[in-house]
Design a protein with these regions (language model features):
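Residue-level marker for isolated small/hydroxyl-bearing positions within beta-strands
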Residues: 50, 99-101, 158
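Short glycine/acidic-enriched loop and turn motifs that connect beta-strands
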Residues: 2-4, 54-55, 102-108, 161-166
Length: 171
């Protein structure tokens, strides 16, 4: 499998018809073969790459430029869960949400869930502490994507099990 992250330049902002590939980052040597999600901090000096059962944190030498030097910082081990498919941070990086798919092994500890972590320091995985999990199996047993509205009071989940996309109020 070609596990890589591709960077495209858009000569007109938000216009994909102007896209051109400018860089391909091969999967870091310490990674598995299942990167599905990538997030940057707000100023682009950190990148977070989902790597199967963990989230890896890297410093980026030049903001939002994956062709610059990436330095491994830390990871959040998630091996107790089945498979991370997506992640989202709060705007200030003090809350991290991880979306997981259920396994097919009959072990109900690996249901489709959103895991919430608080980060004492924004966008710093070494300060992460578990808060809670929210089960979404009844709405979507094979979730793939997670997003929040700008107020953070609605979460949107997409998936592939044939159920409709759902959005739930966040209390």
């Amino acid at each position: 499998l070609d596990q890589s992250i591709k960077t495209f330049s858009l000569s007109t902002a938000y216009d994909l018809s102007t896209a051109s590939l400018i860089h391909t980052l091969s999967a870091p040597s310490n990674s598995s073969t299942s990167q599905q999600s990538i997030e940057f901090n707000t100023n682009g000096t950190k990148v977070f790459i989902e790597d199967g059962d963990e989230i890896d944190e890297y410093n980026v030498a030049t903001a939002f430029d994956l062709s610059s030097t990436l330095t491994y910082v830390d990871s959040l081990d998630f091996s107790f869960a089945d498979h991370i498919t997506s992640m989202a941070f709060s705007d200030d990086g003090t809350v991290l949400f991880l979306l997981t798919q259920q396994s097919n092994d009959g072990d109900d500890t690996n249901d489709a869930n959103i895991y919430e972590y608080n980060l004492t320091t924004g966008f710093d995985l070494s300060t992460a502490t578990y808060v809670e999990k929210f089960n979404v199996e009844n709405e979507e047993s094979r979730p793939e994507g997670i997003a929040f509205n700008s107020d953070g009071d609605q979460v949107f989940i997409t998936g592939t099990d044939g159920k409709n996309s759902s959005n739930d109020e966040v209390n």
